[in-house]
């Protein structure tokens, strides 16, 4: 019996889902901008109680892009559960676990390709295409002008965003093509079930880490800071 617990906390609309032997045993959503850390544990405990002695096979966690603190909380919870339950954990890009991304993986889908767009802040935006395996490519950064050119070159793609479309700096025609959506824990499981064993093992072997739009920024201590003074 395969039992999979999924955690998605990269967005304020967080969710947890438990799937076992072809059936959904538990799903919960909770909304929080600041305190995922205090809200995630109750639904996790409720989900684990429903295992009723069955072993947990895998813990999945959405790795963003999204809230840095929210994503880190989900990763920490996944790591802790994997240790406690002696099972592997794997991270999946949250963009793939959205309804538009999953819709192109269905037979006879209206669209055969999907691309996510997002606000990367400081005048930059990102795009991420959904691969044939159902996963999301690494986000690619660009300015507004290049973004419009890229989107105009893929007129048949299903476009979606985790942000408000009005924040993307696009013309009205392109905005009308874009669907706003959110990742869901149950769709992390959906992505996972569609992967072959080779890809699953690759994901197991990768350390859990957030999907960064930019390299993590570390501020340098100013000259004269107590830590820089010579003893």
Stretches found by the model and what they are:
Residues 46, 79, 83, 104-105, ...:
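Short, well-ordered alpha-helices that flank and scaffold nucleotide-derived cofactor binding pockets
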Residues 44, 78, 99:
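Generic structural marker for isolated residues within well-ordered, non-membrane alpha-helices
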Residues 17, 29, 58-60:
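Short, conserved beta-strand segments within well-ordered enzyme catalytic domains
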Residues 42-44, 63:
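Short, conserved active-site loops that position catalytic residues or coordinate cofactors/metal ions
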Residues 60-94:
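DPxDG-like acidic metal-binding loop motif
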Residues 44-58, 150-158:
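Phosphate/pyrophosphate-binding loops at sites that engage ATP/ADP/AMP, CoA/4′-phosphopantetheine
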Residues 1-24, 31-39, 90-231:
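Oxyanion-binding and handling regions
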Residues 49-56, 82-93, 108-110:
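Phosphate-handling active-site elements
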